[in-house]
Structure formats: structure tokens, C-alpha cells
From Swiss-Prot:
It catalyses: 6-carboxyhexanoyl-[ACP] + L-alanine + H(+) = (8S)-8-amino-7-oxononanoate + holo-[ACP] + CO2. Catalyzes the decarboxylative condensation of pimeloyl-[acyl-carrier protein] and L-alanine to produce 8-amino-7-oxononanoate (AON), [acyl-carrier protein], and carbon dioxide. This is 8-amino-7-oxononanoate synthase. The lineage of its organism: Bacteria, Pseudomonadati, Pseudomonadota, Gammaproteobacteria, Enterobacterales. Keywords: Biotin biosynthesis, Pyridoxal phosphate, Transferase. GO terms for biological process: biotin biosynthetic process. Belongs to the class-II pyridoxal-phosphate-dependent aminotransferase family. BioF subfamily. Substrate binds at R21, H133, T352. Pathway: Cofactor biosynthesis; biotin biosynthesis. One of its GO terms (molecular function) is pyridoxal phosphate binding. InterPro entries: Aminotrans_II_pyridoxalP_BS, Aminotransferase_I/II_large, AON_synthase_class-II, AONS_Archaea/Proteobacteria, AONS_Proteobacteria, PyrdxlP-dep_Trfase, PyrdxlP-dep_Trfase_major, PyrdxlP-dep_Trfase_small. Pyridoxal 5'-phosphate binds at G108, F109, S179, H207, T233. Pfam families: Aminotran_1_2 (PF00155). Homodimer.
Length: 384
């Protein structure tokens, strides 16, 4: 088989399964409206949960940062790319979330890959929720450690897997809010099972941070859990991009020595760090509380109004509201129908989700209005 045959066969298999991914160039992709091909759609695919991507204070902070620092960092943080803007953001994040240290990364994917690659060795074991994000599971598979998966949100199954003999250290991996199902993990029970067996807990709270908990402190704060490793990302509730690892002083020092994704990557632009500090200020303010309250009301409006007779509505009280339709082709048809009716919705299919669980992944944001939710419900009712 040639290289071209290998590539062609893989693409043909995806097409045959109605699982081929496509990108669409949009004029505007965040916020209430999505604009593509000179047409405006109600946007139910954005992760900009609090509507901060267009917040004037955050935009101005980025502009001022660019005027002061330039548009790039100029290098790795270990060389010349760690600025006072990065330092201020790390210190603010650590204080906000109750950790000794925070380390910034260019993406959540990079943060997850970095911490697992740096910490795990041959005799170690990773025990991950089977629905954990691809970045976590890929990192676990690529690491020298053994990977075991526990049944989704099942602390008892987790405990049994942790009880099996292990020659090294054990790391439990889960998410605060799961990206494709929108449900939350029972973090207190999971952390208890881990602590009783001297295992550490890593929680990726990409979809909870900024959006839930007091001052938007996220899923762990809401459940009064402090994992040894907390990953927060900035492309959802913060409306920007990037990520951070929250940890102890010694773990931060260790990662600065051994996290290759951190050492050998150009750090985020200082202007971005300054914008993120501005986003954090909004999230923690009374305005941030008002935005979370409005989002919660929109989520309740949707769940109360959806007619789920032809769909399986996931048990989610987050901004992620998946409608499980099962068949790939049907999910694509429904997404096309909704777009024809002016609602931009994405069909999510395997391998992103398990086989037979293709879905419409609807996301609600603070930028929506009540009439937008009502329009979505009307279109869904007609499409179902």
C-alpha cells in the first residue's frame, strides 16, 4: 500500500460512515449570531458561554497589551517569553482558585498532554473516566503508564480499578463538566476514592470554570473539592483561549523542569495574558454573576420547553445540551435542517462520541435572548 492509498482509504472509510469532518469559513463565529456566506444564523455551537469574546473591557485590555508588549511573546517562558503580564495572571488565578501556583499553557490540549507526559512513568497507572476528553486519553495512551478506564461517573468502579496492585503511582483523571454530554462528575466521591488509595486526582474543568460556582470558580469549588491537579481553559467561559494548570509549589517547580510542552513552546502573547486578566475581573464581578444567572435561566427555559419525544435529551444542566439521535446520517440531516431554518447547530459523530450516539451538540450562551431559545425549540419541534 502506498502513502496515497493509505490516506484515500482512511478518508473513504470516514465518508462511508457519514463521519467525515468539515470546516466552514465564517465571518463571525462567536456570540449570539454566526455569519457565513453572507447569511446570519442564531449560533448554538459556540463555547463562548458568558459572551465575553466581544466584551469591550477585554478587547481594550488586549489592545493595550499589544501596544505595550507587542503582538507576540518572543520565545519560551524559559528564555524571554515570560512577562509581567503572564506573572500577574498566574498569581491572580492561583489566588482565585486557592492554589499555591498556576502555570499558563497555550491550549487546554497542551496542558493536559504536558502534565500527564511529565508525571507518569512505566510502573504508574492512569485511571480515567471513559468519556474523558481526547487530549487526556491520548496523553494517557502515549505515556509509558498503564491506562485503565472506569465506567462514566462511577466511583465504585474507579475504586475497584485503583485497588488492583500497582508498582508505581496512580493518577485519576476526569472532567468537571463533560464536553459532549454536558453532565458533571461526582467529584467529591471520586476524590475520596482516590485519596483513600493514595492516588492523585486531575480534573479538567474546561467547561465549568467561569460558568459555575461562587465567582465562577468552577465545578471543583462548587463541590468543595481541591484536586491535586486542576486544569482550567480560557476558550469557553473566559471567551479568549489558552489554559492553566493549578497545583502545589513543588509540582509547579517540577513541571517547569519536565513539562516539555511548556519548555519548548513559545508562550502566549503577553497581550493575551492581559486580556485574560481583564476577563477574570469580569467573571469575578457582579456583572459576571449576572451573566451566569442569565445563562442559567436560558438553560432552564430550553430544558423546560424541549419536546424530547424524538430525541434523547442528555441529563445536563450546563450550557452544553446534547440531543442524542443515534444515527450519523440522521444527525447530519437534522443539523442541515436546523441551518436551513436559521439555527447553526453542529452534528457530533463517532469517533468523537461512542458509536450509536451521534448527536446535535447545542450550546447556549449568555449572549442569547429568550426569543432565541423559543425559536430553537420551534425549529426542533418541526425537525423532529
Amino acid at each position: 500500500m502506498t502513502w496515497q492509498q493509505k490516506i484515500d482509504d482512511a478518508l473513504t472509510a470516514r465518508r462511508s460512515a457519514d463521519a467525515l469532518r468539515r470546516r466552514y469559513a465564517v465571518t463571525q463565529g462567536a456570540g449570539r449570531w454566526l455569519v457565513a456566506n453572507e447569511r446570519q444564523y442564531l449560533n448554538f455551537s459556540s463555547n463562548d458561554y458568558l459572551g465575553l469574546s466581544h466584551h469591550p473591557q477585554i478587547i481594550r485590555a488586549w489592545q493595550q497589551g499589544a501596544e505595550r508588549f507587542g503582538v507576540g511573546s518572543g520565545g519560551s517562558g524559559h528564555v524571554s517569553g515570560y512577562s509581567v503580564a503572564h506573572q500577574a495572571l498566574e498569581e491572580a488565578l492561583a489566588g482565585w482558585l486557592g492554589y499555591s501556583r498556576a502555570l499558563l499553557f497555550i491550549s487546554g490540549f497542551a496542558a493536559n498532554q504536558a502534565v500527564i507526559a511529565a508525571l507518569m512513568a512505566k510502573d504508574d497507572r492512569i485511571v480515567a473516566d471513559r468519556l474523558s476528553h481526547a487530549s487526556l486519553l491520548e496523553a494517557a495512551n502515549l505515556s509509558p503508564a498503564t491506562l485503565r478506564r472506569f465506567t462514566h461517573n462511577d466511583p465504585q468502579h474507579l475504586a475497584r480499578l485503583l485497588d488492583a496492585p500497582c508498582g508505581g503511582q496512580q493518577l485519576v483523571v476526569t472532567e468537571g463538566i463533560f464536553s459532549m454530554d454536558g453532565d458533571g462528575a461526582p467529584l467529591a466521591e471520586i476524590h475520596r476514592a482516590a485519596r483513600q488509595r493514595n492516588a492523585w486526582l486531575l480534573v479538567d474543568d474546561a467547561h465549568g470554570i467561569g460558568v459555575t460556582g461562587d465567582e465562577g470558580r468552577g465545578s471543583c469549588w462548587r463541590q468543595q473539592v481541591k484536586p491535586e491537579l486542576l486544569i482550567v481553559t480560557f476558550g469557553k467561559g473566559f471567551g479568549v483561549s489558552g489554559a492553566a494548570i493549578l497545583c502545589s509549589e513543588s509540582v509547579a517547580d517540577y513541571l517547569l523542569q519536565f513539562a516539555r510542552h511548556l519548555i519548548y513552546s513559545t508562550s502566549m502573547p503577553p497581550a493575551q495574558a492581559q486580556a485574560l486578566s481583564a476577563a477574570l475581573a469580569v467573571i469575578r464581578s457582579p456583572e459576571g454573576a449576572d451573566r451566569r444567572e442569565k445563562l442559567a435561566a436560558l438553560i432552564q427555559r430550553f430544558r423546560s420547553g424541549v419536546k424530547a419525544s424524538d430525541f434523547t435529551l442528555a441529563n445536563s444542566h450546563s450550557a452544553i445540551q446534547p440531543l442524542i439521535v443515534g444515527d450519523n446520517a440522521r444527525a447530519l440531516r437534522l443539523a442541515d435542517t436546523l441551518r436551513e431554518q436559521g439555527c447553526w447547530v453542529s452534528a457530533i459523530r463517532p469517533p468523537t462520541v461512542p458509536a450509536g450516539t451521534a448527536r446535535l451538540r447545542l450550546t447556549l450562551t449568555q449572549a442569547h435572548e429568550a426569543q432565541d431559545i423559543d425559536r430553537l425549540l420551534e425549529v426542533l419541534d418541526g425537525a423532529g
